[in-house]
């Protein structure tokens, strides 16, 4: 049984560990699908089939979007376009799996992007991605290298769409 984004379990186990699915089932936790964090896996039907089969009996599903070399706030329009392409592939994979919650990274790189640029460009990017996303989708913008939480709060306020929330990764915050 799939839960809605608002009623999902509060504790989720990351699929990065081979034991994660079993732990999520045993302790009735949510489960984060990480197989598609590596963007080329979005194009591999064998990976998709294996992931789909592994979800039996799991609830509170999240899908972690790819993040390496995907920069929504990129200065180069081709880099930004590739990020949009990969995130659209992620939305499609989530829909195929019946997952309504996706963790995304914003691509902030200190000393490359001014925080003001990052916020401005991120607002435009997430609004564009959400413009053709399903109504029952929740994107969670996760902290990675941002200078502090206020940057992400400004993005969420600027996007002004209930389908964009924030995700605190305590490992990235330290």
Report each predicted region and the residues it spans.
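Structural preference for beta-strand elements that scaffold enzyme active sites
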Residues: 8-12, 28-32, 60-62, 99-103, ...
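Active-site acidic/histidine proton-transfer and metal-coordination neighborhood
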Residues: 73-165
